[in-house]
Design a protein with these regions (language model features):
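Gly/Pro-rich hinge or "lid" segments in bacterial periplasmic/extracellular proteins
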Residues: 78, 256, 262-312, 317-323, ...
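Ligand-site clamp/hinge motif
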Residues: 364, 382, 389-439
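Aromatic- and charge-enriched surface segment that lines or borders ligand/interaction sites
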Residues: 107-278, 415, 482-485, 489-492
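Periplasmic binding protein-like
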Residues: 42, 134, 416, 421-426, ...
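N-terminal lobe/hinge region of extracytoplasmic solute-binding protein
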Residues: 43-116
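Extracytoplasmic/peripheral linker and loop segments enriched in polar/acidic and small residues
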Residues: 155, 202-217, 221-250, 254, ...
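Detector for C-terminal structural segments
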Residues: 48, 60-67, 317, 321-322, ...
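Append "and occasionally in soluble cytosolic enzymes with long acidic Gly/Pro-rich linkers
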Residues: 377, 385-387, 484-616, 753-754
Length: 755
């Protein structure tokens, strides 16, 4: 289901790649030249498939394994900002949370925007990188990897082929994978000049149905791993229903999906774009269908990939793309291992494999090799065994062995206590916090104690945020949902709800969540900070633009001030206000509203009691505001996707780049607020078109202020996730400081120590 996938969870795998694959934190010059004779056991999500290649890993768990073995060109910092100047011995120092941190990278990247609209990305890598097998890395390895990702038959998870790289379209032209040609031609095709009739029949009767079933199974597995505990899922049918389809098993789910999309797999709103959890349908096909078929002429190389030295290259794009820089965090993978060195000759347009045939690369998928902090040794019985790489660029890890063990959600905390694992990342809420407190010998009232004799808990901001949305087409005055009167109506309601956020979010989360005031996750570098000029608490000014609250006000006084300010907004919206109440509504306005919330039908949601309180207060001044608690999350999603919800409570996922197009642009695919504002659209496009981060941050703040002025979204909370470690076995002092979703416990794995 589109919203469930994209809004709540799809970014998790990407984040893990960025934080684990670029394990480049504090520089360690050795000290203890021999790795400590210790083994660290870390939990990993169930779903290992043994596909550990940096090119073809599919599941989140497999991708994480690849990240420990592979060295990437550069990491992102604690706010997800690429580290582009960290190659030198002194690294690159950046401030976070009032502290300076130094980041190291395998390569530097310089970005230059040209007057003609083209962009140069000049990359220079270190000349002392050595793979764990002793061979030396050069820029040819990076070029090899680029051509793997950009091959016409590439069917992994990377999407570099969608970027505006000069000459890419010409290179990929004239060849297509067999499955693509068969799919486009259709089941009734009669032209068998490029394939046989038997091949076509086999594709439609066996190949595609089997791939579809595997695709559906990947969704089921993804849902059960990530959401079984939160949603009380017990069977595959439960997972299928949560994703929004019918069926008792994967085959039936695929039939339901295929029917719902009328067979549209590759369209902009097709199955691959909308439903994929961690892989596309095509990634599930038999390899026989991925072979490249020549259909015409094509370029021999990609003109925008230019080798400029043994350790440098330039990538040229035809225009600026804000996501391009993140895609350049590339694996430095040995071409001689993953490809064929005899097939590499840059000057003669040979790039380590035969164009259209990636079989040699895929043959190494189960046994990765790289220059990362650890060396792959084995995978069996749900455990990946890795050993310290003495040739690692930042120094040999102090932990000799790292075991990554599949662990169910229910066994993560108990596993750390029992000693079967040392580090885990369980889902986090007050019940889990109380479980951890009990294991540490604390009382239930001491659940906010994070450090104990058995377990240490490190909280990390969740890559996303909770919010309340408003449909302006249903909460308006007259026929214009964007008139000042309509805005004031929505602002009045938001003012009432906003003042209670601190109290009710704290009562649900304690100090494991914080109130936010802009529609963006605090994890983003673009998020306004309280110290920034012009920072404001959401809906804290009255209809005349004056502050509603003062620092001296008590909580009760703030509540009273909010009601007074809200009445001012309602009056400006055309309501009749007398004796502290709305006594009459503008013509055509009923002043009866409902908020949709997915609290399981039991009220278990961080915003449920807040919405109930809002209904009570609004009711006391003449406005009906009721809460509708959905037992099934899919039903909630449907209400705001189909435009029937007036108000709803949900959560957005956050991407590494803060691009606002999808959610707020007039043409955004998930613009559920139906905003169509030229000024806002222009700001969003300006933000997309610049590499200047301070400029983009200012642009996005202006855009967010427009959104808040429309009164269509009330930012609510930034919640936390957690990492739980054994206090008895792990040296907690060697963890990275100020961990974030982008810089987790493994970001400086080479300096982590056991006791």
């Amino acid at each position: 289901m589109k919203n469930f996938k994209k809004v709540l969870a799809v970014l998790l795998a990407v984040v893990m790649v960025l934080s684990l694959a670029a394990c480049t934190g504090k520089k360690d010059d050795g000290g203890d030249k021999g790795a400590a004779k210790k083994t660290l056991v870390a939990s990993i999500e169930q779903g290992l498939e043994g596909k550990f290649s940096p090119f073809f890993s599919l599941s989140q768990s497999d991708t994480n394994v690849a990240g420990f073995v592979t060295l990437y060109t550069f990491p992102v910092d604690r706010v997800g900002n690429p580290v582009l100047k960290g190659m030198g011995k002194d690294g690159e120092t950046r401030s976070y949370n009032g502290k300076d941190y130094t980041y190291y990278a395998a390569a530097n990247v310089e970005v230059k925007q040209n007057d003609d609209g083209t962009v140069y990305y000049d990359m220079t890598m270190r000349d002392d990188i050595v793979y764990s097998d002793g061979t030396k890395a050069t820029i040819d390895d990076v070029i090899f990897g680029l051509y793997v990702y950009l091959d016409p038959t590439y069917d992994g998870n990377a999407t570099m082929y969608s970027l505006p790289i000069e000459g890419l379209e010409e290179y990929r032209a004239g060849m297509a994978p067999l499955y693509q040609l068969l799919y486009v031609a259709g089941e009734d095709n009669t032209d068998f000049s490029l394939w046989t009739e038997d091949q076509q029949k086999a594709f439609w009767t066996e190949g595609l149905p089997k791939a579809g079933e595997a695709f559906a199974q990947s969704i089921i597995d993804y849902v059960m791993i990530n959401y079984a505990a939160a949603y009380g899922l017990e069977t595959e049918a439960d997972a299928i229903e949560l994703w929004g389809f019918s069926g008792e098993n994967a085959a039936e789910m695929w039939a339901s999906i295929y029917d719902a999309y009328k067979g549209d797999i590759d369209g902009e709103e097709g199955i691959n774009e909308t439903e994929a959890a961690d892989r596309t349908v095509w990634a599930c096909l038999d390899p026989a269908y991925t072979v490249g078929i020549k259909t015409g002429e094509s370029a021999a190389n990609i003109t925008g990939i230019q080798k400029t030295g043994d350790y440098s290259l330039r990538i040229v794009t035809t225009k600026f793309d804000a996501t391009m820089i993140y895609q350049l965090s590339l694996p430095i993978a040995p071409m001689a291992y993953y490809g064929d060195a005899s097939l590499y000759n840059y000057e003669n347009n040979q790039f380590g494999f035969t164009k259209g045939d990636l079989s040699i690369v895929k043959s190494k998928t189960t046994t990765p090799l790289g220059a990362g902090p650890f060396v792959f040794k084995s995978y069996e019985n749900g455990t990946v065994h890795l050993e310290a790489n003495p040739k690692y660029l930042l120094g040999e890890p102090k932990i000799a062995n790292l075991d990554l063990r599949e662990t169910s959600e229910a066994n993560k905390v108990s596993g750390v206590v029992a000693g079967t694992i040392d580090i885990a990342d369980p889902s986090y809420d007050t019940d889990r916090a109380k479980e951890i407190a009990a294991q540490n010998g604390f009382s239930a009232d001491e659940w906010e104690k994070f450090d104990g004799p058995k377990l240490t808990t490190k909280l990390i901001d969740y890559l996303g945020y909770g919010y309340m949305g408003i449909n302006p087409n249903l909460v308006k005055v007259g026929n214009d949902p964007y008139s000042d009167a309509s805005k004031n109506l929505r602002k009045g309601i938001n003012t009432i709800i906003s003042v209670y956020r601190d109290e009710y979010i704290d009562s649900y989360y304690g100090n494991t969540a914080s109130v936010i005031n802009y529609p963006i996750s605090n994890t983003s570098w673009a998020a306004p900070q309280t110290t920034d000029d012009g920072y404001q608490i959401a809906y804290s000014k009255d209809v005349n633009g004056n502050p509603i609250y003062t620092a001296e006000m008590t909580v009760e006084q703030k509540h009273e001030a909010a009601v007074k300010a809200a009445l001012g907004f309602f009056e400006a919206a055309g309501c009749t206000v007398a004796d502290g109440k709305v006594t009459a509504a503008p013509a055509g306005v009923e002043l009866k509203y409902q908020v949709e919330i997915g609290a399981g039908g039991t009220g278990d949601h961080p915003l449920y009691l807040l919405m109930q309180k809002a209904g009570e207060v609004l009711g006391s001044i003449g406005i009906t505001f009721t809460v509708n608690d959905w037992a099934n999350a899919n039903d909630l999603y449907a209400t705001y996707q189909n435009g029937t919800a007036q108000f709803w409570c949900a959560a957005w996922g956050a991407a590494t780049d803060p691009d606002m197009y999808q959610l707020y642009h007039s043409n955004g695919s998930t613009n559920y607020y139906h905003i169509s504002d030229k000024e806002l659209d222009d700001l969003i496009m300006k933000g997309r078109a610049s590499a200047d981060q301070p400029y983009r941050k200012a642009i996005y703040k202006s855009a967010m202020e427009i959104i808040l002025d429309y009164g269509v979204e009330l930012p609510m909370y930034q919640r936390s996730e957690c990492t739980v470690l054994s206090t008895e076995r792990v040296n907690i002092d060697t963890l990275p400081g100020d961990m974030t979703p982008y810089w987790g416990w493994a970001a400086e794995i080479h300096t982590l120590e056991m006791k």
